[in-house]
Swiss-Prot record:
Region: Domain I, interacts with DnaA modulators, residue numbers: 1-75
A Pfam short name: Bac_DnaA_C
UniProt-recorded name of the protein: Chromosomal replication initiator protein DnaA
UniProt entry tagged with the keyword Cytoplasm: yes
Classification lineage: Bacteria, Pseudomonadati, Campylobacterota, Epsilonproteobacteria, Campylobacterales
Assembly and interaction partners: Oligomerizes as a right-handed, spiral filament on DNA at oriC.
GO annotation terms (biological process): DNA replication initiation; regulation of DNA replication
Annotated family: Belongs to the DnaA family.
Gene this protein is translated from: dnaA
One GO molecular-function entry: ATP binding
CDD domains, per database record: AAA, Bac_DnaA_C
Chief location category: cytoplasm
Residues where ATP binds: G151, G153, K154, T155
Signal peptide annotation: none
Record Gene3D superfamilies: 1.10.1750.10, 1.10.8.60, 3.30.300.180, P-loop containing nucleotide triphosphate hydrolases
Length: 449
């Protein structure tokens, strides 16, 4: 007669043969056979929480019935067997104290705190929500998603939450979606998913940057879905950062969009001139650089919205003044900013331009490469041409092949169309131009590093 452990093992082995590895890891491997409640015509199983219980019942109860009806698991069963899956009243929880959550400190930037986050009307709501999250012992809102354009302080606020939570001796994981994917694939290939789950599903604060990059990766979305469910079911704080609202993340599964909106969503707006000037002054103080008031005002007025670019401009002005042994004045600032903005965008690849335009218009890159009558796609193709003409060498032939244009004269028409809209100060296109430039600068920065 087989032992209860043998029976459970055999059931799971048979189930494992009929589902994908990721399905088995995320669902069926979580089941525990309950011999005390089971009878000849009904088999009871435990799942660790209600989310898994409901999911396994809906997706896999028929499979389990089929396995049991084959009567190959060493049980005395009736011809027809029912399956019941319940939430365990007392699920054995392993000791997670040995997980080195302190190691995640290296992924959290000490310099990003609430104390040095410049607050203005553009970000006050996000700041207050973030402080409340960090200071609370239980999640006041869950999940929380902050979104907004590049360089507006989203990563700063995420790190500030992490730093404050660490001061309270909380277990914190801060990770980008790219690193989450890399870690997931490593553990999957090494068949060490248990340690992956230990790390990500048992922290007090799960902080994810660049959540928009989860889209289009089915395995990653599947794993994140279950990580999210378990964290949420166990009342662990989830904070997500994205460059756009959940509904505008093209290609993201609807079930993830839905979960992202369960709690609270808040947008970081571009800073107004007063806030930008405060940021410039703070960055000067942090970098121990003294600039005349008129130079700080000029930087605030002429750097669009990107805080990282403001800091880069401050440092470059100071360096140039030292190298030239010249005073820091308005003329120097104008020269440096003109060169800086030109340098940041020059050398952009067509791929980066395409990606920046696609992200700004919430399209897939593949959609833009094919001619279409859809207005947003047609506009996107014109914008790719415009930026390619500005920032890539000899773009005509490359562009024709890249966008599948048979007539090279089309490139001139598309470029002229955007140029005319900018000259007419079309507000939508002007806004798009700044957003695309910011995204290009960020993509180019990543390439350099």
């Amino acid at each position: 007669m087989d032992t209860n452990n043998d029976i459970e093992k055999r059931i799971l082995e048979l189930a494992k043969q009929q589902v994908s590895p990721i399905e088995y890891e995320n669902y069926l491997s979580q089941l525990k056979y309950n011999p005390n409640a089971s009878k000849s015509d009904i088999a009871f199983f435990y799942a660790p929480n209600m989310v898994l219980c409901s999911t396994i019942t809906a997706k896999y109860s028929a499979l389990l019935k089929e396995i049991l009806s084959q009567n190959k698991v060493g049980m005395h069963l009736a011809h027809s067997v029912d399956v019941r899956i319940e939430v365990a009243s007392k699920v054995h929880v392993s000791d997670h104290s040995n997980i080195n959550y302190k190691a995640t400190k290296s992924s959290i930037k000490d310099s990003y705190t609430f104390e040095n986050f410049v607050v203005g009307s553009c970000n006050n709501t996000v700041y207050e929500i973030a402080k409340k999250i960090a200071q609370s012992d239980t999640p006041p809102y869950n999940p929380v998603l902050f979104y907004g354009g590049t360089g507006l302080g989203k990563t700063h606020i995420l790190n500030a939450i992490g730093n404050h939570a660490l001061e309270k001796h909380k277990k914190v994981v801060l990770v980008t979606s790219e690193d989450f994917l890399r870690d997931f694939l490593k553990h999957l290939n090494n068949r060490s998913m248990d340690s992956f789950k230990e790390k990500y599903r048992h922290c007090d604060f799960f902080l994810l940057d660049d959540a928009q990059f989860l889209q289009g990766k089915p395995q990653l979305e599947e794993e994140f879905f279950h990580t999210f469910n378990e964290l949420h079911a166990n009342n662990r704080q989830i904070v997500l950062i994205s460059d756009r609202s959940p509904k505008n993340i093209a290609g993201l599964e609807d079930r993830l969009k839905s979960r992202f909106e369960w709690g609270i969503t808040a947008k970081i707006m571009p800073p107004d001139l007063e806030t930008k000037l405060s940021i410039v002054k703070q960055k000067c103080q942090l970098n121990k650089i003294i600039l005349p008031e008129e130079v700080m005002e000029y930087i605030a007025q002429h750097i669009s919205d990107n805080i990282r670019q403001m800091e880069g401009a401050i440092i470059k002005i100071s360096v140039n003044a030292n190298l030239m042994n010249a005073p820091i004045d308005l003329n120097l600032a104008k020269t440096v900013l003109e060169d800086l903005q030109k340098d940041q965008a020059e050398g952009s690849s067509l791929e980066n331009i395409l990606l920046a335009v696609a992200q700004s218009l919430n399209l897939k890159s593949s959609e833009i490469k094919v001619s279409s009558r859809q207005k947003n796609v047609a506009l996107a193709r014109k914008l790719v041409v415009y930026f390619a003409r500005l920032y890539t060498p000899n773009p005509t032939l490359s562009l024709a092949q890249f966008l599948d244009l048979k007539d090279h004269s089309s490139i001139s028409k598309m470029y002229s169309s955007i140029k005319k809209m900018l000259e007419e100060k079309n507000p939508f296109v002007l806004s798009l131009k700044e957003e695309i430039k910011n995204r290009l600068n960020e993509l180019n920065d990543k390439k350099q590093h």
